[in-house]
Amino acid sequence: MKPRPPTMRIKKRYVLAAIVPNYPSIDSKVLYVAIAEAITGLYGDGAGAALHHAVVFAGDGYLIARCSRGSEQFLATALAVVTEVDGQRVAFRTLATSGTIHALRRRMRQPVERPEREDLEVDGVIYEVHVRESQKVDLIEKGCNSQKLLFLVEQDLQER
């Protein structure tokens, strides 16, 4: 059997979404079921079947979902409705839509390797250093009686 020519194939679109918070491992099948339930709840069974959605990639804090062309808005709306996956609270933030997976993979931010700093002393008080995304740094005071939080950026940390 010969493959169909490109003009007769079903056109697909891919949606890139960030998984918040970044869980290390969420199974693609579980994500598919959660998205399917959201689509069915919003648009019904007929529209859910017409979307032809699938989870292509799930990992590293990102999700790539496939759908038929013209229905990417419906998929993005359904992703925004999902609040729980496999008993874990989760949210999907739609970042981009493209016709190829390669273009979406270029948009994924690669995790930045940062040197781990265990403790930092500020004004005679010892703090635990927690480096977050986008150059944010949280300092949590060590001790069990009281916790004092300081919020810095990496530039402030380099000055010390």
Swiss-Prot record:
InterPro entries: Pop5/Rpp14/Rnp2-like (IPR002759), Rnp2-like_sf (IPR038085). Its EC number is 3.1.26.5. The keyword Nuclease applies. One of its GO terms (molecular function) is ribonuclease P activity. It catalyses: Endonucleolytic cleavage of RNA, removing 5'-extranucleotides from tRNA precursor. Its main location: cytoplasm. SUPFAM superfamilies: Rnp2-like. It holds the Pfam family RNase_P_Rpp14. GO terms for biological process: tRNA 5'-leader removal. GO terms for cellular component: cytoplasm; ribonuclease P complex. The keyword Nuclease applies. Keywords: Cytoplasm, Endonuclease, Hydrolase, Nuclease, tRNA processing. It is found in: Cytoplasm. HAMAP family: RNase_P_2. Belongs to the eukaryotic/archaeal RNase P protein component 2 family. Part of ribonuclease P, a protein complex that generates mature tRNA molecules by cleaving their 5'-ends. Consists of a catalytic RNA component and at least 4-5 protein subunits. This is Ribonuclease P protein component 2. It comes from Methanosphaerula palustris (strain ATCC BAA-1556 / DSM 19958 / E1-9c). The lineage of its organism: Archaea, Methanobacteriati, Methanobacteriota, Stenosarchaea group, Methanomicrobia.
